[in-house]
Amino acid sequence: MALGDKNQGSSKSQAKQKGTKGKNAQPRLKSNQLKRLKINEELKELQSRVDNFVPPSEITLFSELPMSSKTQKGLKSSHFLNPTPIQSLAIPPALQARDILGSAKTGSGKTLAFLIPLLERLYLEKWGPMDGLGAVVISPTRELAVQTFMQLRDIGKYHNFSAGLVIGGKPLKEEQERLGRMNILIATPGRLLQHLDSTVGFDSSAVKVLVLDEADRLLDLGFLPALKAIVSHFSPVQTAPGSRPSRQTLLFSATQSKDLAALAKLSLYEPLYISCNKPGEEGVMPANLEQYYAVVPLERKLDALWGFVKSHLKMKGIVFVTSGKQVRFIFETFRRLHPGLPLMHLHGKQKQPTRLDIFQRFSSSKSALLICTDVAARGLDFPAVDWVIQLDCPDDVDTYIHRVGRTARYQSAGTALTILCPSEEEGMKTRWGEKAIEVKRIKIKEGKMGNLKQSMQNFAFKEPEIKYLGQRAFISYMKSVHIQKDKSIFKIDALPAEAFAESMGLPGAPQIKLGNQKAAKVRGPSKEELARKAEKEEEEEEERAVVGSDEESEEDESEGLGSEDEEEEIDDEAEEIDDEEESGEESGSDEETEEEKDASKPKAPAVRTKYDRMFERKNQSILTPHYTALIAHDADNAAGAGEADDDDDVFTLARRDHNLSDDEEADTDAILGAEALAAELKKPLITSEDLSKRKLKAAASKKGLLKSRPGPEKVLFDEETGEAREFYKSGVDVEKEMSAADKRREYLEKEREIMKIQDKIDKEVAREKKKELKRKRKERERELRQMEMGDEPVAYLGGDDDYASADEGRSLSPSPAPSLEPERHAKKQRRGGVQESGAGDLEDEEALALRLLQGS
């Protein structure tokens, strides 16, 4: 009954619950809808926290900031717990969609100060894969863009955004296919502008966050027109009053300049100025940085650097020089000297995979030396850099600040050393004083400096490539000093050019024409200059040879316009124009008449096809026309402008007026015609001038050289005399000697004689072995017979010592091997079950044992 009542009561309660559900219950929701509602509630709560957030006086943890759980989780997994001063000041207003213009010392964490607001803004906007591009970060160099991308990937790995890297050095078509799927884009300005202008379907009107990293460097590289064009593609900043701006702009830099104000007016809307420096100390140095400078003559700078490297073999350092030509020259020469420290080099002319590989290898190395240009001076965070050596004087104090900022990052210690020429000391000290930067002077002892003069001369003498690199490095350094604006520091007349060239292993200073090339780095060559250069290349082969070979390499490597490569390419163009003008003057351009000048007026450049570019290819090694032009300059200076070159092996014959008869003249003409025809036939049908650069490279490769070289010769050495003789002989020598059948017969006879001698020796050895075995068998039989007869064994001491010593242990004991009769007899006795034993046998055995013991 109780069980029935219980069941009845439960059924009633279930019916009651069903009735209530049918009247008051809400409709059932799917899991996706619940998840969406939960996300919306979290976003509303986060937005209210951001709007109502009042930053405290000091923020010590990232968890105190109003950020999403995904960003907090990414920061914690990357071990970012405590914000730096610039981060604690810039992140709270940036989270509220304010435009920021921030300035802080190098290594203070400016990258996180704009990456965190970028992620939070897109997260609050519910940005998804179908929304397109939402944030853009513009960096001045490729390496800095790669570093920013890696940092974004670490802290944003828990978000669902797609990020991409668009820099030079990669095919444009591959990047165009991926642009439509990117939410966050990190790019260099040149390549980004190229995509904005040419990529079909690339919509950038919905960008919510624009970041300009190292903005002053972007302006120094002449990217202001490109930045104006890029900003024009994005959505406008101003919106309705009281609402959130449609686009937020964050601008960060380590130094402030006048041009930043123009850029701020262009892209920022009511910006908030944030600076972690004290008033009047913009660009102040890190507290843990020790700064020194040394005054060294120009011709001893390489000696000072070599001595420093040899005395710091366990350090991790960066050496800054002015141009990529100097980087290559120092790297190639120091590499051949084997300093005992890993050497790496980085400059703007390298291919992008090579630059990334060097960047990663140097970052992961504990001790290494990186020789580089200013391409690595901005924003790159190399861990644990101990020394920064500036072998060349920096352009200005801002460049100095960014160079030395590669060490002493955040709270780590570092040391900076600047090597100045005597003429640069006073001007640089004045500029340091204006920025309140204290740099101590040190003196390098003579014993600590190296002596590379003889080694450099040997390298230049043995390897023409090193000599060519030295000439280009010398020219690029002198031109970089010439185009500097601050003439109180850079005085080209005070530099010892001849001594500097001699220290680089050169026989003399190369000829340089320093024309009035104002603002050459900014504007590049004009259209008239390019047209004049094309006209001269078509007219004279000599002038075409003077033009440098770097033009083709620049065309291949300058796919990415937004990088440090642009500045170096413009420098090389200006250098080629100077060389061309110099060669034009040497070839007699001063003697042109008015008619020739009118005829050589620049024409409108025609369309260049791929076949035109194919015929314009030039060598890029020591066979470059520019290198031959440098050699020609030296020869002209030595022999005079009007004299012929000594290297020419062609004799010029002057015709004399002799009284010749008609027959003699006819004979002479016939002889001369035959000689000319023979000389013409001796000439090759195809010369190197008729081949393309690809064919010349293939001929210079290992495979091509092996084809042109003669085959290897096999040499045999006589076993008796040791004399070498050829394995293969010519047909005449073979005919003089005996035939092949006679040689085989002679060889077989010699081998038969040798085999007969060996057979005799083998037979004698076999005969001796048989005799010895027979003798040993007879000895054992004799011993056994004596033991059976009861006599004492006889020890034979004569004969061979080897056999006596070998049988010494067993000569006194019976061996069962020679005869099996005792064993058979014993077996028969055991088989019969009766074994005769008696006192006589036992006594005999005891006596035998006693005799054996006494005999032994």
From Swiss-Prot:
Sequence ranges of Polar residues compositional bias: 7-17
Protein residues bound to ATP: 104-111
Record domain Helicase C-terminal: where: 288-460
SMART domains named among the record's database cross-references: DEXDc, DUF4217, HELICc
Keyword entries, A-Z: ATP-binding, Helicase, Hydrolase, Nucleotide-binding, Nucleus, Ribosome biogenesis, RNA-binding, rRNA processing
Known catalytic reactions: ATP + H2O = ADP + phosphate + H(+)
Enzyme type, top EC level: hydrolase
UniProt biased composition (Low complexity): 811-820
EC number: 3.6.4.13
Acidic residues bias locations: 537-597
Biased composition (Basic and acidic residues): 525-536
Domain of life: Eukaryota
Ranges of residues in domain Helicase ATP-binding: 91-274
DEAD box (motif): residue ranges: 213-216
Any GO CC annotation of this UniProt entry: nucleolus
Biological function: ATP-dependent RNA helicase required for ribosome biogenesis. Involved in the release of U14 snoRNA in pre-ribosomal complexes. Required for pre-rRNA cleavage at site A2.
Quaternary structure and partners: Interacts with the U3 and U14 snoRNAs. Associates with pre-ribosomal complexes.
PANTHER family, per the entry: RNA HELICASE (PTHR24031)
Name the UniProt record assigns to this protein: ATP-dependent RNA helicase DBP4
Organism, as annotated: Cryptococcus neoformans var. neoformans serotype D (strain JEC21 / ATCC MYA-565) (Filobasidiella neoformans)
